[in-house]
Amino acid sequence: MKWLIASDLHGSAYYCRKLLEAYDLEKADRMLLLGDILYHGPRNDLPTEYAPKQVIAMLNAHKQDILCVRGNCDGEVDQMVLEFPIMADYCVLELGKGIVYATHGHHFNEQNLPPLHKGDILLHGHT
């Protein structure tokens, strides 16, 4: 199975289109989104082509292909409009004898690792 991994769209229709173009080009089976889907947060500038309603429509059209974890800018109001789960703090995928631990990065990251074995993989965004 081929996964396309992305993070931190922050409501940018421009980057969401780029994501979906890459998804089609790479012929990926699934998308793993590492949070911060719709909102940019009060500390951040508006992203390029900030249009969360467009992002909602584009991603909901692919809801069956998306696995997502919650970012620090994601909330229950976002879950009300997205038709795929976004509220998990992390997900764990089996990979051979190890795991892939996917999270947003605001709790666990290189400086604060989750419990991992040698050979396990940590994926995070929070860019």
Question: Model-flagged regions — what are they?
Answer:
Residues 5, 32, 102-104, 123:
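Structural motif
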Residues 10-12, 72, 104-106, 123-126:
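Histidine-centered divalent metal-coordination motifs
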Residues 2-95:
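Core catalytic region of metal-dependent phosphoesterases/phosphodiesterases
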Residues 67-77, 103-116:
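Hydrophobic transmembrane alpha-helix bundles
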Residues 84-88, 96-99, 106-127:
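Conserved beta-sheet core of the metallophosphoesterase superfamily
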